[in-house]
């Protein structure tokens, strides 16, 4: 994948950054694409770096993801909760599966969606081959993860656990407005504020 380079003029001459490093200077992390261990490690490292830079200043996590590996997503989620710096989440495009869970896990009052973004929650997917006893062990594990993910969505959204369990039995798609009513986000933003306010 080709990553654009940004060139800035400084008092000491020119300085070039890849676009993601330049965004990081403004405390913006971009999570685009499927979530796996590699992506999770990069996002976690950026969260920890920005926390060390200024633990009181907002971090802005932009999400455009179809979801991915549950344990990788949970590693990002737990880090968001662990650090002191408030994490604002913004859905651009889509936040599905683990992407939706991360979107809901932003600082309350600072969870956003752009106008035409789509949000989707569902139960975790899994496939395992092997001996019958191993398949049974993995089935039990995925059921435990399903229960925990539903509890987190219920806690973050304010919905009853029973409703979340029913809604996640199948793919449950939402517009920004529907996600706001559900409690996954707090507001829809059509334009970035010109001064002050959230990003």
Curated annotation (Swiss-Prot):
One of its GO terms (molecular function) is ATPase binding. Keywords: Cytoplasm, Hydrolase, Protease, Serine protease. PROSITE patterns: CLP_PROTEASE_SER. Its main location: cytoplasm. Its EC number is 3.4.21.92. Pfam families: CLP_protease. SUPFAM superfamilies: ClpP/crotonase. One of its GO terms (cellular component) is cytoplasm. The active site is at 97 (nucleophile), 122. It catalyses: Hydrolysis of proteins to small peptides in the presence of ATP and magnesium. alpha-casein is the usual test substrate. In the absence of ATP, only oligopeptides shorter than five residues are hydrolyzed (such as succinyl-Leu-Tyr-|-NHMec, and Leu-Tyr-Leu-|-Tyr-Trp, in which cleavage of the -Tyr-|-Leu- and -Tyr-|-Trp bonds also occurs). It is an enzyme of class 3 (hydrolase). One of its GO terms (biological process) is protein quality control for misfolded or incompletely synthesized proteins. InterPro entries: ClpP, ClpP/crotonase-like_dom_sf, ClpP/TepA, ClpP_Ser_AS. Fourteen ClpP subunits assemble into 2 heptameric rings which stack back to back to give a disk-like structure with a central cavity, resembling the structure of eukaryotic proteasomes. Belongs to the peptidase S14 family. Cleaves peptides in various proteins in a process that requires ATP hydrolysis. Has a chymotrypsin-like activity. Plays a major role in the degradation of misfolded proteins. This is ATP-dependent Clp protease proteolytic subunit. It comes from Geobacter metallireducens (strain ATCC 53774 / DSM 7210 / GS-15).
């Amino acid at each position: 994948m080709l990553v654009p380079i940004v060139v800035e003029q400084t008092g000491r001459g020119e300085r070039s950054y890849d676009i993601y490093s330049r965004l990081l200077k403004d405390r913006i992390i971009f999570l685009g694409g499927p979530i796996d261990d590699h992506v999770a490690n990069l996002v976690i490292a950026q969260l920890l770096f920005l926390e060390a830079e200024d633990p009181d200043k907002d971090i802005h996590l932009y999400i455009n993801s179809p979801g991915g590996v549950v344990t990788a997503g949970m590693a990002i989620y737990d880090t968001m909760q662990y650090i002191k710096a408030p994490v604002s989440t913004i859905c651009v495009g889509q936040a599905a599966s683990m992407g939706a869970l991360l979107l809901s896990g932003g600082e309350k009052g600072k969870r956003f969606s752009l106008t035409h973004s789509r949000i989707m929650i569902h139960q975790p997917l899994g496939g395992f081959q092997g001996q019958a006893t191993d398949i049974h062990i993995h089935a039990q594990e995925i059921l435990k993860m399903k229960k925990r993910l539903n509890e987190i969505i219920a806690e973050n959204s304010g919905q009853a656990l029973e409703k979340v369990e029913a809604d996640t039995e199948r793919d449950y798609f939402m517009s920004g407005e529907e996600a706001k009513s559900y409690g996954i986000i707090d507001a829809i933003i059509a334009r970035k504020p010109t001064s002050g306010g959230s990003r």
